[in-house]
């Protein structure tokens, strides 16, 4: 068990470095393929001033540093929670340190990991937003930037809201499906913590997107300041909950959700101030919530029905997830929460439109 944990830690540490190395090699390959064209463009260039390597390095540093600091502050959230719960809390309550570390391992290794999966999709979309928003603002096309931001926020909510509901409703079977070597007690704790964290999926998705939008608008320091404020609020909340309640590890889950919610509100407010932007409410938030509620009810009913017959969580949860996704897709279109044009902007959007038209959901 110790060796497996060690290899897991080594793998997670190596994964980050290998990912960056592969990206660097990919960029080098792209440059090698386009080197001839780049050199020809350089020869045709008529600019007399050429930046020195020092100036180029300084410019890159000034651009990249805020992104690095922002990521560092984001990661501090988990570090602070870890320190509070595993180092300060045991001395406060005179608790066994080994038990505390085991419980926090369940929180960070299972519940938090599962809640981060949907957020990864929002992060990918957020990365794609920076150049497009920056381009529109450079062209002084504020209206175009607002439309782009509005569509990105709506797309993020259409994906993250059902993910949050799905994780809440199917927390235990999903955890059991992916973590097969855990005891029933560990699975129950991980599932309960995942349910507590499910709301943070929506908050993190929106705050991550808005953070990238702000960076695309040139407000590179704003997300860092907002993350710092949210970190202070989270720390105070975690300490107070651990001191004055018996919520134990749930205090950390609640504080984590509060952190993401605070980030979401502050970043959204900053984007609104920067471009005078107001998000449409009904189709972006209300309809996805109602469609997700129907989806959640269907997922729970199908899972419980299949579990009564099969007595297997793993066999029951997969059909429940698939049918729940279909129910959400149908309800979202029937409630007119998404247009054909918006649906085409999704990954495999043209295929989704084709399926919807075949099923007569779209005309």
Predicted regions and their residues:
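Membrane-proximal transmembrane or re-entrant/amphipathic helices at the cytosolic face
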Residues: 301-363
